[in-house]
Amino acid sequence: MPRKGYIAKREILPDPIYKNRVLTKFINQIMLDGKKGTAESICYNAFELIQEKTGKDPIEVFETALKNVMPVLEVKARRVGGANYQVPIEVRADRRQTLGLRWLVGYARKRSEKTMEERIAGELMDAANNTGGSIKKKEDTHKMAEANKAFAHYRW
């Protein structure tokens, strides 16, 4: 932990096309090796694919997908008297969003479609419909928290 207090969070600029800050975070999550232009083109092409396939506004699909993927509870390891307990805790709003974005991109990368645009589009559409890998991850996280509810009194 820092001794001189906490560092202020950097302000994230909204993306150039949709003027959305959360979308900028999503693009940053897609980005590899600092290639932001490539990440932006992947994201915007994926949004065009979503527009073609669903006929809905891609930003709405993205926001619905993110809302469906964001976890409410997670478990954190806590050592008590020589034993490690998985203690369920509520997820802070900023971490909830970060985890949702990370899971969406992570499970999109694991998909079998040919291009990254197709993978991102597929994962976003699946998550908006409450299916797909990222939704399964959220459900597994919630199941773990539910299974370890008995240790909730170890919260700190």
UniProtKB/Swiss-Prot annotation:
The keyword RNA-binding applies. The keyword Ribonucleoprotein applies. One of its GO terms (molecular function) is structural constituent of ribosome. One of its GO terms (cellular component) is small ribosomal subunit. HAMAP family: Ribosomal_uS7_B. Part of the 30S ribosomal subunit. Contacts proteins S9 and S11. This is Small ribosomal subunit protein uS7. The gene is rpsG.
